[in-house]
Amino acid sequence: MLGWIAKKIIGTKNEREVKRLRKFVNQINELEKELDALTNKELVELAQELHDKIRFDEELKERVIKGEITPEVIKAFALVREAAKRTLGLRHFDVQLIGGLVLHEGKIAEMKTGEGKTLVATSPAVVNGMTDEGVHIVTVNDYLARRDAQWMGPIYKFLGLEVGVINSDGKTYLVEWVDPEKVKEAIENDVRVWPKGYYEEILPSEKVNIDAKKTYFTTLKEAEHRRKAYEAHITYGTNNEFGFDYLRDNLAFSKEEIVQVKGHNYAIVDEVDSILIDEARTPLIISGPAQIDSQIYHVADAVVRKLKKDKDFTVDEKNRTVNLTEQGIKKVEKMLGIDNLYDLKHVDLLHAILQSIRAHHLFKKDVHYIVRDGEVLIVDEFTGRVLPGRRWSDGLHQAIEVKEGVPVKEENQTLASITFQNYFKLYRKLAGMTGTAETEALEFKEIYGLDVVVIPTHKPMIRKDHPDLVFKTKEEKWERVVEEVLLNHIFGRPVLVGTVSIEDNEKLSSLLKNKKLLKEIANRNSFKRRLEETAKNLGVSPEEVQKKLEEVLKKGIPHNVLNAKHHEREAEIIAQAGRVGAVTIATNMAGRGTDILLGGNPEYLAKQMLKEKGINPEEATEEQFREALREAYRITEEEKEKVKKLGGLLVIGTERHESRRIDNQLRGRAGRQGDPGESRFIVSLEDDLLRLFGGERVSKLMDMLKIERGEPIESRMVSKALENAQKRVEAQNFQIRKRLYEFDSVMNIQRDVVYTLRRQLLEGENVHEKIKEFLKDIITQKVNELLPEDDPELWDLEPLKAFLKELTGREVEIPQVRDKEELIQKLYEELLKIYEEKEKEIGSPEAMRELERVILLNLLDNAWREHLHTLDRLREGIYLRGYAGKDPLIEYKREAYELFENMMENVKLNTLMTLFNVQIKSEEEIKEVEHEEEKKHQRLLEEAELQGVQGKSDKKPRPKTLKERLKEERLRKRKLKAKKKEQE
């Protein structure tokens, strides 16, 4: 009670935070008129002065990196707003500046859909870009990385900052002006998109200087090397690509191969919930072929097809696990003619059988994956998008390939891996944006140390969120969805329907084309009453309604389908989903990142109109572009008013997701920036969530109430049951992610040690000192191990002599000493002399340093690869320790530490042994050794694949093989060289 009173008096923590930031926004606003009075040239010069001040003043630079809001940060934010007005005709709202300040401070800004997150990121990106330490803007797909970099490019370029883009197809781009000479002129002549002295929040279309807008267009130009994108002040790319580049850098054999030259300074993660939570169970993995025969999966598949569910094996859908029953074990043993399936020699076979059961009974085609061109492609359950190149781990993908009768790709061995959780913790400052983060605030704080600040909307939110309609069967649910779409489509109201799978997506699409079903619905009395009532409310005559109804019944309901199979036109479909009469069916959050504007997007429409006239939008003249844009503005404004009168966009969800956040994201597609809109979920008791978590109680209630077919139930008890089910699943998933993080953090410490050592070797730090350090360590360890007694009289020196001979390749005299310390020191000095002789034999200190580097790097890489493989196996079996009353995590930490210590000792020993015994006559031979090692390394990388493998039962990434990428890179370089020659 007292807490509630205190909140009323002093406000919630979030309200206090927003209030604190408003003071800074007022300071930014005070600079607006002053900056507006400056010419373009003066503004550009001011930006350059500020850039120099931030990057050269070390103390100020550090304060900016830490996220302090200094007077320079205020000035940079004001400059960004002014640059956006002059180049794009967009002005940051106050709430967008608050969002930007939250990002600058290294927090998460929760901003509702349509509040302009893309523009919000520009202010913190510019001020942190001015430190010259690098800013990474992380998007969920390649298209958004390219689009956002190009769209916001004019702001950055105007203020003197360079922008790079990395894509998963291996291509790298730099943002450049389309016509640099024109821009130069426009800056000289003070040409602006937003007129001088105009201080309203939004610029009406008739006041936009369209010629100026076209002048400030940017384009993406391909760069020769990926490093170029990272050398820029700001780099756009996907989470996968930033992560894979980090791993590739740590597989590099020379300094020149490293691309992330600025390290990890500051990252702004767009759709932060999707990347840091939904994909947190996804380790990014670079792997090479492993020696496992794929024939075993064919045997397993043949066996599983003869087994019966519930008799021979059990399936737990909630926990996604499978087990053989006693009867099943005997049946398998009989079929395969073996005595004991659980014998150690059959462990791979047992594993393949269990994975095959999971492939057949837990993973469905067109829900969890699709088959295209003889390949099994994973579908992201959160977005409904195909994840090209990603493969399930642990043989599951191979089991599904056999099930579907497509070629089986061999299993892989890990070369390098990291989870997104640990990758993003590399950044000195991390920030993120999303429309829905509050429900996961605890996880953001606990795992990443990030606070969530909910940013107020620019205009009050007036969307109506209706209670769920719950039907007994899926069939009744789908009929009601079709009825809702039909009713609203007749009046021209745009409808967006969200489905959870491609299968549902395509099912609904066929129902909307089913004229027989549409007629049946149209003839129902309940539908006729609703139609009449809606027409009356909207003032539409019965004749008009009848005419439109007949038209729809004749042709079916025209609609756009958006799923993993039809992703090419994603942005275009979503951008026009708010037009009059538009019906869009999308899997979950497909199209996320593109706003649904009521009436449609004028710029997309203008491009479409030019294409219809046979004109390429990129090559259109200023006059053609201006004319198309004016017409597009007129059409969209007209349609916007009509859609508003109809109640705005209607969003229909067809199934509750495991996470409330995903449901909220779908609802959030309607009612952007104060627009009207409605949302409703139409669900059934046969949907997975209710079926697995508490649908029985609701089903009994429906039987008790004698609910007839086609009648929904609306009750608080049902809503509560759904919410409780979601909370249980969310808590379960959080624990899984937390556990994964705890396990990966053990490896993270080890990875850090190995990668730091690798980087030192590549950057040419004194390897010789490292070798001397190794020598001292090995001598100390061996003396203590082989001479356990303290008294020299009791020492048996033969084992030590044998070891020293094995190490150096020659007899080493053991000196007379008083104690172990003296022995260690004298042996160290003696072995150093032998090592110096070897150096003279090699030819020169420089040649020896290079040999040290190549040998240590090679041995370290081999040992780390084997260590990762050992850790994978350790992790698989560690959970069994729980049955013995031991904590698997503590056991894993202990054993992983011992394994790592042994690995490092072996690296030291093998490096010394190789260097002492190497037989090389000249420096040329050293270069040859180095060249051979590089070739071997290159072959390994060419065969490697990039994967994001999501634990046992899940999915995720591997864009193209590096072999393909390297080939493309070589081709691209040739083309660029040829182009340059032509120009010369």
UniProtKB/Swiss-Prot annotation:
Q: Where is the composition biased (Basic residues)?
A: 972-984
Q: Where in the cell is it found?
A: Cell inner membrane; Cytoplasm
For the protein in the UniProt heading, the enzyme class is translocase
Spell out the subunit comment. Answer: Monomer and homodimer. Part of the essential Sec protein translocation apparatus which comprises SecA, SecYEG and auxiliary proteins SecDF. Other proteins may also be involved.
Q: Name one GO biological process term.
A: protein import
Q: Which organism is it from?
A: Aquifex aeolicus (strain VF5)
For this UniProt record, the keywords arranged alphabetically read as follows: ATP-binding, Cell inner membrane, Cell membrane, Cytoplasm, Membrane, Nucleotide-binding, Protein transport, Translocase, Translocation, Transport
- Residues that coordinate or bind ATP: Q96, G114, E115, G116, K117, T118, D595
A single Pfam family, by name?
SecA_PP_bind
Nucleotidyltransferase among keywords: no
State what this protein does: Part of the Sec protein translocase complex. Interacts with the SecYEG preprotein conducting channel. Has a central role in coupling the hydrolysis of ATP to the transfer of proteins into and across the cell membrane, serving as an ATP-driven molecular motor driving the stepwise translocation of polypeptide chains across the membrane.
- Provide a Gene Ontology MF annotation, just one: protein-exporting ATPase activity
The EC number of this protein is 7.4.2.8
Main subcellular localisation: membrane
- Membrane-related topology note: Peripheral membrane protein
This protein is called Protein translocase subunit SecA
- Which domain of life does the UniProt lineage start with? Bacteria
Q: Where is this region: Disordered?
A: 930-984
What cellular component GO annotations does this protein have? cell envelope Sec protein transport complex; cytoplasm; plasma membrane
Disulfide pairs? none
Task: Name the chemical reaction catalysed here.
Answer: ATP + H2O + cellular proteinSide 1 = ADP + phosphate + cellular proteinSide 2
Matching entries from Gene3D superfamilies are given as: Helical scaffold and wing domains of SecA, P-loop containing nucleotide triphosphate hydrolases
Q: Which PANTHER family match?
A: CHLOROPLAST PROTEIN-TRANSPORTING ATPASE, SECA INNER MEMBRANE COMPONENT OF SEC PROTEIN SECRETION SYSTEM
UniProt biased composition (Basic and acidic residues): 930-942, 952-971
Q: Which family does it belong to?
A: Belongs to the SecA family.
Q: Does the keyword Cytoplasm apply?
A: yes
